[in-house]
Swiss-Prot record:
It comes from the Bacteria. Keywords: ATP synthesis, Cell membrane, CF(1), Hydrogen ion transport, Ion transport, Membrane, Transport. GO terms for biological process: proton motive force-driven plasma membrane ATP synthesis. Transmembrane segments: none annotated. This is ATP synthase gamma chain. Produces ATP from ADP in the presence of a proton gradient across the membrane. The gamma chain is believed to be important in regulating ATPase activity and the flow of protons through the CF(0) complex. It is a peripheral membrane protein. One of its GO terms (molecular function) is proton-transporting ATP synthase activity, rotational mechanism. Belongs to the ATPase gamma chain family. F-type ATPases have 2 components, CF(1) - the catalytic core - and CF(0) - the membrane proton channel. CF(1) has five subunits: alpha(3), beta(3), gamma(1), delta(1), epsilon(1). CF(0) has three main subunits: a, b and c. The keyword Protein biosynthesis does not apply. It comes from Pediococcus pentosaceus (strain ATCC 25745 / CCUG 21536 / LMG 10740 / 183-1w). GO terms for cellular component: plasma membrane; proton-transporting ATP synthase complex. Pfam families: ATP-synt (PF00231).
Length: 306
């Protein structure tokens, strides 16, 4: 059944309105991406300095000495808790997704590859503890009857450092209470405006040996004088290091999210433009057919009158 000119015209108008919306959303996402990239550049300098100090302490064997002494603190996050290692019975996964859709394959990629990582390491529902930052990940696991031990929704478009302190405090407390024995952060790492890659980072326990042996810190010397004591220094720097890991992951994930949203909206706008072009061609053909029919009818009527 042929579509009438009016129906085609309505579809063209509707598609143009949709294209205006997706174009506006693309511009918003691009602006957010530029904003968070400027913010991230400054933060990376801080994060690298903190990691360098922790690596320095690891090479000085001060971190292992602190664990041996079990130096506790009255502060919310204890350095000894962050360093304490024990046999792994349960593994926690802090999964970072977005709160909404319209981000292409961003969320499905994180969830799928996190599940693949769990399967590869033999972690089942019984020994995998899910902690979700972002509503999409939380809803996914809940809809599949998987308990979500912790969720955090409403992360800002450009997250602040204070936002993640609640997350770090909560997951550290859960680790101290032995709700899980190790914790991984799973998220999409921003590569460029067109692509991202899945990344898994071990957050807890903080591995001093891993940092000390990291090739990136080979030039770090192992001579540190600490005041007032190694324990006091660790108590200050290790919570900051844990916060920097989580904050850095969330910043990275948010950057990838904005890039994915911008790319998805650009693709939607391009598809809308192609559809409009096809509909306009279809409309013009219908108009041409109608005009040809009218001319034929007029010519036929005139011939009948002669």
């Amino acid at each position: 059944m042929a579509i009438s000119e009016q129906d085609v015209k309505r579809r063209i108008d509707s598609t143009k309105k949709t294209s205006q919306i997706t174009t506006a959303m693309q511009m918003v996402s691009t602006a957010k991406l530029s904003q968070i990239q400027r913010h991230t550049v400054g933060y990376q300098v801080y994060a690298q300095k903190v990691e360098s100090i922790v690596a320095h302490l690891a090479k000085s064997h001060l971190m292992s000495a602190s664990v041996a002494g079990k130096a506790k603190s009255d502060q919310a996050i204890s350095a000894a808790d962050l360093l304490a290692q024990r046999p792994v019975k349960k593994t926690g996964y802090l999964i970072i997704t977005s709160d909404r859709g319209l981000v292409g394959s961003y969320n499905s990629s994180v969830i799928k590859q996190t599940n693949d990582f769990m399967q590869k390491h033999g972690h089942t529902e019984g020994d995998a503890v899910i902690l979700a930052v972002g509503g999409t990940g939380s809803d996914f696991y809940r809809n599949r009857n998987h308990e979500v031990a912790y969720e955090y929704r409403g992360v800002s478009d450009v997250p602040t450092f204070n936002e993640i302190r609640e997350i770090v405090k909560t997951v550290t407390k859960m680790y101290t209470e032995e709700k899980f024995d190790e914790l991984y952060v799973c998220y999409n790492h921003f590569v460029n405006r067109l692509s991202n890659s899945f990344r898994v980072t071990k957050l807890l326990p903080i591995g001093g040996d891993d940092l000390a042996n990291n090739e990136a810190h080979e030039q770090v010397t192992a001579e540190y004088d600490t005041e007032p004591s190694p324990e006091a220094l660790l108590q200050e720097i290790l919570p900051q290091y844990a916060e920097s890991l989580v904050y850095g992951a969330i910043l990275d994930a948010k950057t990838a999210e904005h890039a994915a949203s911008s790319s998805a909206m650009r693709s939607a706008s391009d598809n809308a433009s192609d559809l409009i072009a096809d509909l306009e061609l279809q409309y013009n053909r219908a108009r041409q057919s109608a005009i040809t029919t009218e001319i034929t009818e007029i010519t036929g009527g005139q011939a009948a009158l002669e």
